[in-house]
Amino acid sequence: MKFTTGNDNRNGSVSAKASKAEPREDYYNIDPSKLYVKIKRTLSQRDGAGAGQIEVTLETSSEFVGFQKENYECTGLTFTSKGTIKLPQDAQAMATGVVQESIWMGVRIAQAGKVHLTASVLSDMDIAEVRLQGPAFDKRVYDDFDDTLDITTPGEYILKGAYQLAVRTPNASLGGRPISVEIQATLTPVS
């Protein structure tokens, strides 16, 4: 079984702001002329100086595996994303860091069958999820998942991954260490 491609909405952004300066930002968004192509990007921004510097990074990769433009079919979906905020060394520094990721990759499944979903969420906070949503079920993953799922109802299924990591300092509860979130998922048909 192969998948027919459907929805493709992939985007992410980073923002770093120290003291009263304007934030430094970067973002990506899937270009409509490049739907279903593999994306591999690193976005990184920093603001402030010396011990007051804050740094934000988004490393993202997503792919409609084996995508064939002639018939809009693919053999699977996969993505991985890691967001990190490195806090200022000065615990009293005023800074804001934001890393955001939203991945929606859809496929049309024409007949009942089975798919295999492998997914993981590693997060310092409850801010991230991986989700497979469609007519037969809505499977949410908040930690690790590796199992075969029954597609009893044909239709469009969307593999989603999303998080928003936002930090404002000074904040003594953060402990000064970098804060990160990582999500990954792979969806494949089962023969």
What are these regions (language model features)?
Residues 108-116, 154:
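Extended extracellular/luminal ectodomain segments enriched in beta-structured repeat modules
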